[in-house]
Amino acid sequence: SFFVSRRLNPLLAQEEQISLCEIGFASQTRRLNPLLAQRGSDLLRKQGGFDMYDVAIIGAGVVGSAIARELSKYQVNACVIEREEDVCNGTSKANSAIIHGGFDATPGTLKAKLNVRGNFLMDELARDLDIPFKRNGSLVVCTKDQDRSGLGKLLDKGNANGVPDLRIIEREELIAMEPNLSDDVTCALFAPTGGIVCPFHMTMAFAENACTNGVKFFLNTQVDTIEKNGDSYRISTLHTDTKNKETFEAKVVINAAGVYADVFNNMVSENKLHITARKGEYCLLDKDAGTHVSHTIFQLPSKMGKGVLVTPTVHGNLLVGPTAVDVDDKEAVNTTASGLDSLAATAARSVKNVPMRQVITSFAGLRAHEDSNDFVIGEVKDAKGFINAAGIESPGLSSAPAIAEMVTDIVKGLLPLEKNPDFVGTRKGILRPDTLSLEERNKLIKEHPEYGNITVSYT
């Protein structure tokens, strides 16, 4: 059956009714969704009464799922442990859905290196895994009251990071590209390699392909404790629905737990991490507003982030956001009247006449900001076999494919990995009936009656 949940995936509210989330990932039958069919201990290798793995990944967001897919290229017994009922239910589901060019990160940082590499990998991944992706280009705009030297600094950073084809353009050319830019905009940094993607479909693609290649996913499974046990780690979990307890054993643990990555790191290491949840609120506008801009419009960045952007989405809507407020609660994904009100005023500095009356939903997400202001990726010095992929805030979505490569290289130094001769590198994405003719839809429903049973939930 069809399933739509704005609570679970706000960005999928972009696709109206029948096209919202055809045969949704969390609601597929076992015949349609092999990932959910793997929830059985009969499939597991046992050792000492525990489920024994070479690698256990904590977190099924875009980073954890990308790592799972990259590892599945090798003969490795791996699993992913996720406390939510589906993949992509944390930071990965509620963000700007941008593939950044890579000009903002400080040269020499992991953010800089991995953003540029991840951006480069997206064309092939989008083709092979059927991920909705478009290189629409991005513009960082400068207004009359701002110092345009800020654009020059971004250009220098981008050149140092290896971002291709960056240039600063003046208002006359800008207005020809984007007629709805604010009258105060004077110039902009243009990055043609910037893009937009559906983060839910991207994460789902990684997870499904990893599953196809043998990685086991355990959903509704909350990690309670992690303890060193000789040459491996013992992971105690609680099933969030049944309340059954289960213990996993793994030679290598990969910590991709988003805003909770510091909690798990601090269970095994004296080198403590501190991750702050940085809340960002968004407004999603109707498809009628989707052509208001064609590029992703950024404002000059600050220490809190890249400002409020205005961007089309791959589904044809318009997205405005985010705010940036540090919060103590790692579950604080509520929206606020003040936050949403501020979006319209702030967006107007770069784009005029944004039709905010056409907002169809609002949502908030949390970014995992680590005190070092960079990604924290690597084996923990005092916890051999425990690998962090922590502090993954923007540009984390863009960097995910490259993070997966980096983490897999670290695993290669810990375990003898051999290529998987049966690796399947392609995957067919979710079929959208709204792209089919009436004749094609009828044929589809005849072959798969599930496509004729539509349920829309607004929980």
List PLM regions with ranges.
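Glycine-rich FAD pyrophosphate-binding loop
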Residues: K73-S92
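N-terminal Rossmann-like FAD-binding beta1-loop-alpha1 element of flavoenzymes
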Residues: Y53-C79
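C-terminal catalytic lobe of FAD-dependent flavoproteins
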Residues: G305, V314-H315, E331-Y458
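Compositionally biased, intrinsically disordered low-complexity segments enriched in Pro/Arg/Gln/His
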Residues: Q17, P34, L44-Q47
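Short beta-strand to alpha-helix junction loop
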Residues: K113-V116, V141-G150, F190-E208, F218, ...
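Flavin-dependent oxidoreductases
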Residues: A66, I226-D231, I235-G321, V325-T336, ...
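Helical element adjacent to the flavin cofactor pocket in flavoenzyme catalytic cores
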Residues: L189-K251
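Dinucleotide-binding Rossmann-like beta1-alpha1 core, especially the glycine-rich loop
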Residues: A97-M177, T186, G307-V308
